Amino acid sequence: MRITRDFDVAEECVQDAFAKALASWSQQGIPANPGAWLTTVARRRAIDLGRRRDVAIRSQRLLITDAEMFDREPTAAIEDDRLRLIFTCCHPSLATDTQVALALRMLCGLSTAEVAKAFLVKESAMAARLTRAKKKIAIARIPYRVPERAELRTRIDAVLLVVHLLFTTGHTSPVGEELSQVDLVERSLDLARMLHSLLPDDGEVTGLLALILLTDSRRGSRVGTEGEFLALADQDRSTWHRDSIDEGLVLIGDALRRGRPGPFSLMAAIAAVHSSAPHWDETDWSEIVGLYDLLIDTWPSPVVALNRAVALSFAEGPDAGLRALDELSAEPQLSAYPYLAAARANCLLRLERMSEARDAFAEAAMLTENNVERSYLLSRIEELDERMRVPHDGRHQ
């Protein structure tokens, strides 16, 4: 980006570098520093494209000077190429949501559709947002360079959000045949660990790493032997990854001792309550509701309110949960969100309002684009249909 000043050209150069890597590395082996190899090839491609497009001699000299400056930039603050690029992309001249969306799309490999779902907007709206951001960068000539160590904290909030949304997209894939995208989960965990090594005294950095560890500890328990989705209540907790839980509990304890917790520390604290319960029916739902109350004050969002309503349904009963969920039905961001319909379905089922529960499960199945989730929701509909069938004696069950 520093060389081309154009996101589309930069993306073309990166794709060309990866294509050359596939051809070269298969014959000559992977170089000692793959990231530097790719950067060099992409940079050469950018300079070559500039020459082919008849860039003026003076501009070309500036281009080459920029490339030389890139070579001389200090890298000690952020040693990992991926993390360095994310910090670079999160430029404070752009709105935080735009920084995050660009990083997810351009650096993390998410499709525009996946980025849109992460932000609860339509794909067309996200595509337009990304296009406007690229134009702003080009017109305003926003300088993209690796930030110095002193600048890291001005960008850390956006970087944390990038890593968090990368994890959530991987943890439950918004589209596709698999419940999770393990490569995205592992990439986000690597990035969270590197952030913690870089800023070990930052409570929110610590909280994010704890959140990922505690949530990912359930990875192997979320799908049954036949590939079916297993809800939290149905999981075998003895199969949860104990080392990840132990590490996460230590980290969240450390984060909470640092003073007023931020959103990632609070989400990690909620995950810690789940991880500490030996069985589903021993979950401290009142504590979870209290933590969600703090989270809403710190980071208000419809999704947080939805999760609080679910917790409330177990702390105070399905009636209370359903009332809270119905209050969210007018939220525009949740109009196509399958988990709102699924949460309503579960409350209605517990209230034995079978027909309404069936309709809500059907709505959730229609909205989700994850086939594992859809199969689970359709199985719930089949169970309800069986329960609602008229018995031989003519009485309704």
Regions found by a protein language model. Give the residues of each.
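Amphipathic helix-loop-helix modules that constitute alpha-helical solenoid scaffolds
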Residues: 53, 57-112, 121-293
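Structural motif corresponding to the intra-repeat A-B loop/turn of tetratricopeptide repeats
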Residues: 216, 279-282, 315-316, 351, ...
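Short, charged helix-capping/linker segments at alpha-helix termini
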Residues: 1-14, 24-33, 123-124, 174-179
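Σ70-family region 2.3-2.4 aromatic/basic alpha-helix that recognizes the −10 promoter
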Residues: 15-22, 32-52, 56-61, 134
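Short alpha-helical "recognition helix" segments of helix-turn-helix
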Residues: 115-117
